Design a protein with these regions (language model features):
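Self-splicing inteins and homing endonuclease
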Residues: 61-83, 136-166
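Well-ordered secondary-structure scaffolds
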Residues: 5, 10, 15-17, 28, ...
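Acidic, glycine/proline-rich low-complexity segments that act as flexible tails and inter-domain linkers
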Residues: 1-88, 127, 261, 307-311, ...
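A glycine-rich helix N-cap at a beta->alpha junction
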Residues: 123-149, 219-225, 229
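Phosphate/diphosphate-binding glycine-rich loops and adjacent basic-rich segments that engage nucleotide
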Residues: 144-195
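Alpha-helix C-terminal capping segments
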Residues: 47-48, 93-105, 187-192, 227-228, ...
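Glycine/serine-rich anion-binding loops at beta->alpha junctions
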Residues: 77-100, 104-116
Length: 425
């Protein structure tokens, strides 16, 4: 078997056999197949796609390339959740303690941010002392003890994905549905949960720009989950504007706490309750929307979040402090009407310029900077109203102020977007 022949086969639209896929993945992980050949293969897959059988085989081999977690010693139905990425996405930080407050065991590994999208682990690391690294034994024991653990991705999990992702990032093959699906699901399967909820974001602030691609990715990942007896549900959600009101690590922790204190925006509060209902249903726990909301805003989710923070070394006093960013700039409405657009991609990139995100994996973060929106799409504004506050390390330049203001689109018609667009199971 020659690698070049398999690249040619896929380039010409052929279907790779189970044995051929194993040969390629095992050879790449062992170092026998060089980067440049796998780069060529990734581009062939990008253009020619893969059958569901090929994607299943690719995912299976990726899972086998690293350590796998066995969570069977934790009683109950273990649930996991994954988002394909977005701007201002602090859902995991609120949703997982909320679900755990119902007695559902949550064993969750999360990632860091890259580019305009934020990462859950970065947000948690803005809390003084919070330890994102845990051994497998510590991770499992904590779930047994308090019902929840939220850590960073294990270095030993899905080695093939780490190699492939780094390669895709520099070869313009990131947004390939077969490669995204196998990357996401290999990590979820290896992490060991029984049931999986996928938040597939769509819109100009997401990797999936249109509904057709989001549906195809969702259907592929749900099918992969079912192939390995992991019930999987995908929820396609809107990422045309930032989620919630805050973008930035510390600012999003503050918003998460406000939501768990019953002081959050209604739209994101409702969205989290709907997502919780789906996760609880997966875990075979019956709960009404009223019960879920009471857990969220009545203190039970927050108590579980505090328990999580303490268990992982976090400082509860630091948890409740506000951002220490030295410069705060108010942005006001330049006309009267309704907020028509707040493009997520543009504001995600703006937050990156403030230091709240990374352009490359080696970039350091400023945990304190970011944006807090006082108005969102569909909200009415009068000229001069406060639309947002920008938290920065230095005074904003005129260029940055102009850039921010031009992306706040005000119209004459009130149109509020739906957060959940479609559910695929």
């Amino acid at each position: 078997m020659r690698t070049v022949d398999l690249i040619e086969k896929k380039r010409d639209g052929g279907e790779l056999s189970t044995e051929e896929i194993s040969y390629l993945i095992n050879g790449y992980v062992s170092g026998e197949i060089p980067d440049y050949q796998i780069a060529a293969l990734a581009m062939a897959i990008y253009y020619q796609g893969m059958s569901i059988r090929e994607i299943h085989d690719l995912t299976t081999d990726m899972v086998a390339s690293g350590e796998q977690y066995d969570l069977s010693e934790i009683p109950g139905v273990k649930v996991d959740k994954h988002s394909t990425g977005g701007v201002g996405d602090k859902v995991t930080i609120i949703l997982m303690p909320l679900v755990a407050s119902f007695g559902v065991p949550v064993a969750k590994m999360s990632g860091r941010g890259l580019g305009h999208t934020g990462g859950t682990i970065d947000k948690l690391e803005s809390i003084k002392g919070y330890q994102v690294e845990r051994s497998k034994e510590e991770f499992i024991q904590q779930v047994k003890d308090i019902g929840i653990s939220l850590i960073g991705q294990s270095e030993h999990l899905v080695k093939a994905d780490k190699l492939l992702y780094a390669l895709r990032d520099v070869t313009a093959t990131v947004d390939s549905i077969p490669l995204i699906a196998s990357s996401v699901m290999s990590k979820k399967i290896a992490a060991g949960a029984d049931k999986i909820l996928l938040d597939v974001t769509v819109g100009q602030g997401a990797f999936m720009k249109n509904m057709s691609d989001a549906e195809k990715l969702s259907e592929t990942m749900v099918a992969l989950g079912h192939e390995v007896n992991r019930e999987t549900i995908a929820v396609i959600t809107d990422m045309s504007q930032p989620l919630g009101k805050a973008i930035g690590n510390r600012l999003e922790i503050t918003e998460a706490i406000e939501i768990m204190q019953g002081r959050g925006r209604e739209d994101i509060t409702d969205f989290i309750c709907e997502m919780a209902e789906i996760l609880l249903d997966l875990a075979q726990v019956e709960a009404s929307q009223e019960e879920i909301r009471q857990h969220l805003v009545g203190g039970k989710a927050l108590a579980k979040f505090e328990e999580l923070i303490q268990a992982q070394g976090g400082d509860l006093t630091d948890l409740y402090r506000h951002t220490s960013a030295p410069v705060v700039t108010d942005i006001h409405a330049h006309e009267t009407g309704y907020i028509k657009e707040l493009p997520a991609m543009a504001f995600g990139k703006f937050a990156m310029q403030l230091g709240a995100g990374r352009a490359t994996k080696s970039d350091s973060l400023n945990y304190e900077t970011g944006i807090v929106f006082e108005k969102k799409v569909g909200d009415s504004v009068t000229q001069g109203d406060l639309i947002a506050k920008v938290y920065s390390q230095e005074i904003l330049s005129e260029k940055m102020l102009t850039e921010f203001e031009k992306n706040v689109i005000i119209g004459r018609v009130c149109k509020k977007p739906n957060e959940i667009l479609k559910i695929i199971s």
